[in-house]
């Protein structure tokens, strides 16, 4: 057996970063257009841009205009990873991107994509951040330091050893940011990097970006809401719906001189300009117009204005003399009074008394009579999505009382229209038009919804082929088409441009006018304060979430000044000082058992000859002895109780079942069927049970990730295969959860209802094809994430742990093989 591989292999002579450092033009784009192979049309229309070192450039434009395509080209994903080609010129420090190598691109550019789920490529938060650094062959000590530094910067240091799939969507987005920060690139490319992050986290993130630019890092960012980053933006590239350049220049030049064109294109304007009179942008007055919130004296609402640290807060919008204000209330109860006016008759659409999702969401109480628009706000991980899932019957919850339209809430009881955080999970039909027709919606109504949500051109397309923004609009339209009295929306404005967001809010107003109740989870506090009737503000997450600041709890300091009508409380994301004081949690240690000190491959090497012996000797006494010995070894391995019991019981159950099947089958010699040649019924049944027991012995205490590391370090398997295997293992949890969500979505939509007891079977089979499509799409996104993280930059990589082959491993293997030889000679 070869010796363990060195921890940090010497990298091949590193290629110099692209171009000469003295060249101030880090990015030079001339006449860029992109063609995805297999499509007729081109994306982008001869876009040109020059981006200097340490400069911040924002790319803005309506949904679908090609912003993501442009930044993918900047990272080299186009044309190196995606089947595509480009016309024009795209240079990084003077080197054409099409001619650059993986190594040079990885050392120059770090990319954060739109989907936080695609950022998960390993099984722990630590390993995800370490992944690109290992690929770049950095020393272990430097990798450890960078990982901890990056996780502190994004507020995830307490979750360092957690499974990324246990994080909320916003926390996974923070994780993706940490990966990019750890790479310390010359150019940081951010594609809507804060779309799933809470308001305080967004503010902290852009403060971090400001410090990076001060140290020389260049940044290209796509974000609909530029206000948090506007003070540090050097130039803006504005595109129209066709991917053609509207303007390139300083923020003031672009937003002031092209305001009307940007508004017509559906671009989010800075807050200071949204209500400004067009006359202000003419003549000499234009340079004096405020552009940033600071210049205009606008205070953007913060989580600290709404949320407490340890209790749920309820706020209600009150209207007096046409003036709106927000007031904190002890409870939300609109059964008899709504918007300050008595109802014609008392009614109840939603009644929640101390509803909670244990371990995931705090207790919430609401009594709604219909026609409300309620926002759930709070930090990442506070439980917003969990509460909506409980209302929709997707997760278990408990409450003193929980009803929707008089019917009890519970898992499996789908009483509300639910718009998933990931819209792809809720689609049940093969075309956009058919999706809206589920539930018997008339063709006329389908046409209206297609027009209203700008999906007419996509009527015959499969829902899973839509862009992110289009899929989000379709997900909302499907719930509207079903005429539910209560609709819950999980981040419905995520990825939407200004026009689509405004249209969605107008449509929700129409639903309210019909007496329907809308409950929305959102990170957009300004949206909630402007459009909602009530707000439920959740406290910070119990772990890895938020900590109170003393000056806020005392009612003084920067957050003491509150917006009109909004009570100040005291919750904030940990600041740098707090994070620096947080110790790094120790790495969880596996339970000590009989095999803990062995190399993960030792047991596999030991049981192989035993398996051969079972096949060759066909002796039921031997098989029973192996079953008994395996049961003892499984107990000695000291895995979790559940895993131990299952691993001990399963082989014996299989043995009994197979013995019964073989013995009660057809006895006529001419039609007898045997599996290979394991002998009679008892020998065959015990043989199969023994083989299963041996497999379980070798795997009951072995972590799959540790086995892969052993193969790549001790046995020199190409690390690319190992990394792909690790990513596949990490995806297993997501794969299972997706399958559950797809089946649940079909239950929510009433699919299979007419089949009665067979409905679960119909939903199960109907979910297989969408699951395959989602799996392929997710695999493609993960592959892009891996490619953007220096995957394949070198032939070797740094391994963070050793898996040496010791004398004890030789002893166990040799002893087992000797015992097999003796037994074979005795029984043969």
Predicted regions and their residues:
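Transmembrane alpha-helix interface motif
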Residues: 580-622, 626-628, 741-828
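Conserved ABC ATPase "signature" region
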Residues: 142-159, 443-458
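Conserved ABC ATPase signature
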Residues: 163-167, 171, 462-466
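Helix-to-loop junction immediately C-terminal to a conserved catalytic motif
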Residues: 75, 392
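Conserved beta-strand-loop-alpha-helix hinge in the C-terminal portion
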Residues: 243-273, 541-576
């Amino acid at each position: 057996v070869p010796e363990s591989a060195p921890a940090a292999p010497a990298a091949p002579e590193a290629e110099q970063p692209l171009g000469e450092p003295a060249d101030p033009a880090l990015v030079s784009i001339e006449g860029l257009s992109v063609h995805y192979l297999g499509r007729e049309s081109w994306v982008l229309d001869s876009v040109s841009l020059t981006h200097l070192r340490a400069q911040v450039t924002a790319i803005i434009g309506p949904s679908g205009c090609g912003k993501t395509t442009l930044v993918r080209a900047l990272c080299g994903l186009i044309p190196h990873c995606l089947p595509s080609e480009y016309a024009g010129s795209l240079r990084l420090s003077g080197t054409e991107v099409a001619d650059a190598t993986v190594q040079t691109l990885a050392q120059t550019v770090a990319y954060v994509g739109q989907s936080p789920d695609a950022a998960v490529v390993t099984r722990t938060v630590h390993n995800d951040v370490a992944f690109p650094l290992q690929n770049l062959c950095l020393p272990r000590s430097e990798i450890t330091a960078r990982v901890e530094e990056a996780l502190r910067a994004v507020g995830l240091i307490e979750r360092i050893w957690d499974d990324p799939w246990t994080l909320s969507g916003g926390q996974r987005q923070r994780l993706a940011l940490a990966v990019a920060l750890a790479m310390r690139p010359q150019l940081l490319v951010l594609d809507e990097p804060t779309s799933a992050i809470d308001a305080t986290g967004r503010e902290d993130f852009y403060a971090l970006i400001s410090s990076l630019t001060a140290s020389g890092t260049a940044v290209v960012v796509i974000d609909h809401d530029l206000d948090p980053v506007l003070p540090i933006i050097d130039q803006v590239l504005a595109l129209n719906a066709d991917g053609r350049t509207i303007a390139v220049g300083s923020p003031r030049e672009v937003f002031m001189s092209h305001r009307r064109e940007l508004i017509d294109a559906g671009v989010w304007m800075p807050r200071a300009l949204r209500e400004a009179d067009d006359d202000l942008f003419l003549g000499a007055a234009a340079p004096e117009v405020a552009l940033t919130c600071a210049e205009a004296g606008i205070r953007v609402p913060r989580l600290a204005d709404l949320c407490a640290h340890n209790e749920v807060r309820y706020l209600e919008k009150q209207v007096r003399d046409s003036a709106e204000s927000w007031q904190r209330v002890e409870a939300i109860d609109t059964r008899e009074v709504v918007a300050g006016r008595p109802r014609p008759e008392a009614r109840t659409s939603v009644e929640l008394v101390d509803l909670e999702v244990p371990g995931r969401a705090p207790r919430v109480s609401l009594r709604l009579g219909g026609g409300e628009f309620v926002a759930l706000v709070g930090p990442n991980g506070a439980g917003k999505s969990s509460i909506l899932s409980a209302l929709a019957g997707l997760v278990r919850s408990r409450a003193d009382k929980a009803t929707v339209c008089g019917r009890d809430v519970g898992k499996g009881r789908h009483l509300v229209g639910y718009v998933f955080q990931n819209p792809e999970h809720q689609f049940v039909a093969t075309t956009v038009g058919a999706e809206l027709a589920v539930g018997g919606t008339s063709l006329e109504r389908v046409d209206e919804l297609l027009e209203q949500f700008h999906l007419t051109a996509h009527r015959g397309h499969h829902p899973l082929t839509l862009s992110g923004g289009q899929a989000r609009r379709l997900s909302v339209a499907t719930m509207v088409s079903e005429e539910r009295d209560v609709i819950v929306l999980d981040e419905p404005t995520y990825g939407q441009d200004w026009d689509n967001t405004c249209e969605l809010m107008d449509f929700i107003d129409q639903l309210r006018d019909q007496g329907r109740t809308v409950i929305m989870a959102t990170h957009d506090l300004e949206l909630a304060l402007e459009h909602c009737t009530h707000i439920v503000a959740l406290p910070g997450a119990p772990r890895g979430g938020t900590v109170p600041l003393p000056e806020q709890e005392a009612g003084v300091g920067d957050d003491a000044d509150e917006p009109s009508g909004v009570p100040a409380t005291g919750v904030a994301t940990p600041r740098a000082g707090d994070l620096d004081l947080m110790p790094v949690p120790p790495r969880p240690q596996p339970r000590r058992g009989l095999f803990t000190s062995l190399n993960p491959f030792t047991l596999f090497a030991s049981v192989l000859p035993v398996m051969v012996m079972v096949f060759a000797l066909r002796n039921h006494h031997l098989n029973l002895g192996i079953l008994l010995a395996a049961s003892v070894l499984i107990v000695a391995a000291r895995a979790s109780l559940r895993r131990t019991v299952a691993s001990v019981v399963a082989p014996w159950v299989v043995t009994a079942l197979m013995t019964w099947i073989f013995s009660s089958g057809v006895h006529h010699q001419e039609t007898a069927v045997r599996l290979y040649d394991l002998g009679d019924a008892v020998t065959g049944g015990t043989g199969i049970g023994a083989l299963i027991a041996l497999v379980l012995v070798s795997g009951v205490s072995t972590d799959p990730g540790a086995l892969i590391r052993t193969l790549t370090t001790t046995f020199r398997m190409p690390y690319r295969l190992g990394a792909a295997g690790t990513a596949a293992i990490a995806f297993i949890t997501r794969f299972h959860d997706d399958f559950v969500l797809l089946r649940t979505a079909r239950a929510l939509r009433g699919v299979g209802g007419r089949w009665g007891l067979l409905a679960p079977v119909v939903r199960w089979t109907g979910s297989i094809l969408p699951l395959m499509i989602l799996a392929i799409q997710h695999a493609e996104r993960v592959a892009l994430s891996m490619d953007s993280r220096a995957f394949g930059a070198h032939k070797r990589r740094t391994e963070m742990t050793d898996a040496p082959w010791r004398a004890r491993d030789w002893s166990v293997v040799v002893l087992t093989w000797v015992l097999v030889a003796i037994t074979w000679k005795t029984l043969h």
